């Protein structure tokens, strides 16, 4: 499959700890709950992104000196509201918030990546800033690693032009961007309505590859060299 080269490279990574994240922590938010947003082949967005989030948590804890990794849910039985997610992140005072999702479309041929960062209605990033820059790393690495097209990285108010929510409220548009006290962004890792993509994400190694793409994005954002591959 197309992702095998990336997975074999991942297998060659030495498990030496990456340094440079000490004092920084991350709140991972696997979107939705239980079996929500069913994929075209019967594998839901909620189950997919939970496993990617847990893999990312494991990679960060085992391969870096990151201070703490938090996660909004840990199993497929939990039902977690948007308020519970953001309130948890704010209560623990996380340095960063990242929400993992997959996208949906009525066109089953569509399969693209997307990053959405918090934006005010005036076009400026929502403070505290950082989501826009992190998204610029994530969108490139995620798209290249998945080898699919992209809708690019957008401020959420600029993306949801069909809604007048930002004009009336000032923004951001997305709840998780609007109600977190730290820099944040939301990723869409392809479309679960695309048959080939929904089949790929059933594979545990593919989900771990997606987690590595987020890990590498975080390292690149911090200017930290990626682990040696070979």
Can you say where each PLM-predicted feature lies in the sequence?
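Active-site-adjacent mobile loop/cap segments within catalytic or ligand-binding domains
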Residues: 27, 34, 99-107, 154-229
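Hydrophobic anchor at the start of a short beta-strand
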Residues: 67-69, 149, 184
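Active-site-adjacent substrate-binding region
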Residues: 131-169
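Sec-dependent N-terminal signal peptides
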Residues: 3-14
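Sec-exported extracytoplasmic/periplasmic mature domains
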Residues: 54-66, 90-94, 102, 139-148, ...
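Structural element of the ATP-grasp superfamily
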Residues: 49, 60, 89, 138, ...
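Short, charged, low-complexity patches
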Residues: 49, 131, 135, 203, ...
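Catalytic-core regions of hydrolytic enzymes
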Residues: 17-133
């Amino acid at each position: 499959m197309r992702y095998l080269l990336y997975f074999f490279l991942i297998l060659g990574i030495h498990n030496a700890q990456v340094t440079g994240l000490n004092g920084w922590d991350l709140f991972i938010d696997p979107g939705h709950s239980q079996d929500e947003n069913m994929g075209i082949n019967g594998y839901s967005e909620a189950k997919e992104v939970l496993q990617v989030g847990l893999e990312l948590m494991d990679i960060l804890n085992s391969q870096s000196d990151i201070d703490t990794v938090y996660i909004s849910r840990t199993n497929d039985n939990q039902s977690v509201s948007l308020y519970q997610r953001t309130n948890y992140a704010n209560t623990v005072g996380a340095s960063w918030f990242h929400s993992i999702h997959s996208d949906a479309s009525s066109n089953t041929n569509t399969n693209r990546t997307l990053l959405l960062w918090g934006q005010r209605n005036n076009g400026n990033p929502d403070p505290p800033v950082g989501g826009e820059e992190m998204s610029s790393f994530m969108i490139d690495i995620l798209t290249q690693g998945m080898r699919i097209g992209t809708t690019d990285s957008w401020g959420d108010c600029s993306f949801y032009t069909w809604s007048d929510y930002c004009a009336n409220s000032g923004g951001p548009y997305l709840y998780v961007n609007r109600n977190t006290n730290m820099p944040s962004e939301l990723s869409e890792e392809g479309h679960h309505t695309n048959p080939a993509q929904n089949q790929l994400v059933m594979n545990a190694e593919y989900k771990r590859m997606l987690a590595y793409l987020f890990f590498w994005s975080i390292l690149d954002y911090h200017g930290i060299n990626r682990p040696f591959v070979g």
